[in-house]
Every structure is written in structure tokens, then in C-alpha cells.
A protein has these predicted regions:
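Conserved alpha-helix/loop element of class I SAM-dependent methyltransferases that forms part
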Residues: 10-27
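Conserved class I S-adenosyl-L-methionine
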Residues: 28-37
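Class I SAM-dependent methyltransferase SAM/SAH-binding core
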Residues: 38-75
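C-terminal alpha-helical "lid/dimerization" subdomain adjacent to the S-adenosyl-L-methionine
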Residues: 41, 118-179
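A conserved beta-strand element that flanks and buttresses the S-adenosyl-L-methionine
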Residues: 87
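A short His-aromatic
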Residues: 93-95
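A short glycine-rich, Lys/Arg-flanked "PGG" loop and its adjoining helix->strand segment in the class I
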Residues: 101-115
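Core SAM-dependent methyltransferase catalytic element
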Residues: 176-195
Length: 195
């Protein structure tokens, strides 16, 4: 699959995110990209051999070659244990706090083995300010007035463990890992379903 990016910045960001999840995706694994956005990260994984399905609450895809299903933000329209890996890349902070746990439960339900999550993880007041600005901007982009919430790394880990997920990997990412004008504190998490 040849991927045509609309900008070098998006190409860089997408390849970076795909590079973070790729070590946890075996060749020919089935992957669900929840909150897929433009679909570029999923396309990068598909180009590496993964079988990828995209889903989101709105259709913002630029990648049309991969299968896609809309979902209502609460219930993923897939069978139990359908995917090897379910990834939520910079998605959960856009989900209202009271719906974060149920969405994690849904992601775990449709996964056979693991979840991979990339999240903004504020560490100070400047991070919280920048995150709030980002959240408001994105809400305007998709025409939503729903609440959103950013958690620290410790808060995310507490939530994951509270859902019965095993945190196998938690890594702080560099502030400028995506772009110089997005100096957000971010983290990557690999979660496994209990045996």
C-alpha cells in the first residue's frame, strides 16, 4: 500500500506513532485503530503487514483503502476478542471522563491480547494549559461540545489497573516527539489482558 501524505509533518508524526506501536504488532496481526482520525498510522501498520480496521465517531479519514466503521463512542461494533491489538492513539483525552473506563472495557472486550495507548500526560501547569487549548481546538474541529480530560501518567495507570488491565510498558516520550510546536508531555502504554 502506497501512502500519500498531505504534509511532511503528518508523515513524520504518523511514522513516529506507528514506530512506537510496531514492536508490539506481529506480522499479519489484526489491529483495530480506535479513534483513527486521518488513518495514516493504521496505513503505516498495514504497509508493514498488519491487517488493520479503522473506527472513529466521525469520519475524518484521508486513507480510504482500509476498512472503516463508525461507532457511537460507547460500543465498538465488533465481536469479542476479534483483534490481536487494539490501539488508541491520542484518543482517550478526548473522551469525557465518565466514559473513559467504559471505552477501555470495550477495547479490552474486542482485543485478544493487548491494548496500545498513546496519550498526552501533563506534568505541570503549562502542560495542562496547552492540553486544554488542544482539547478545545479539537472539539471545535469536530463540532462537539462534550467534555474532555487529560490525565497524568499515574492517573492513567490507576485507571488501566482498575479495569483489570496489566501495565506491561509505560514510557514517557520526548516533549517534541511529534512536532516542535506541540511541546506536550506524552506517554506510551502497552496493556495486556489478564491471563
Amino acid at each position: 500500500m502506497e501512502i500519500h501524505y498531505h504534509s511532511r509533518v503528518v508523515r513524520r508524526e504518523s511514522r513516529h506513532a506507528a514506530g512506537l506501536v510496531a514492536p508490539f504488532v506481529e506480522p499479519s496481526a489484526s489491529v483495530l485503530d480506535v479513534g483513527c482520525g486521518d488513518g495514516y498510522v493504521a496505513a503505516e501498520l498495514a504497509a508493514r503487514g498488519a491487517s488493520v480496521m479503522l473506527t472513529d465517531i466521525v469520519d475524518l479519514r484521508r486513507i480510504r483503502e482500509l476498512p472503516f466503521r463508525l461507532f457511537d463512542g460507547r460500543h465498538l461494533p465488533f465481536e469479542d476478542r476479534q483483534f490481536d491489538v487494539v490501539m488508541l492513539n491520542f484518543v482517550l483525552h478526548h473522551v469525557p471522563n465518565e466514559l473513559k473506563a467504559p471505552l477501555l472495557d470495550e477495547a479490552a472486550r474486542v482485543s485478544r491480547r493487548r491494548l496500545f495507548i498513546l496519550e498526552d500526560t501533563p506534568r505541570n501547569a503549562l502542560d495542562r494549559f496547552l492540553n486544554r487549548r488542544h482539547g478545545c481546538h479539537f472539539r471545535a474541529k469536530i463540532g462537539s461540545s462534550a467534555a474532555f480530560g487529560f490525565f497524568t501518567t499515574a492517573e492513567w495507570e490507576w485507571l488501566f489497573r482498575g479495569r483489570g488491565l496489566v501495565v506491561k510498558y509505560a514510557r514517557a516520550l520526548g516533549r517534541f516527539c511529534r512536532a516542535p510546536w506541540q511541546p506536550f508531555a506524552r506517554s506510551a502504554f502497552l496493556l495486556e489482558l489478564p491471563a
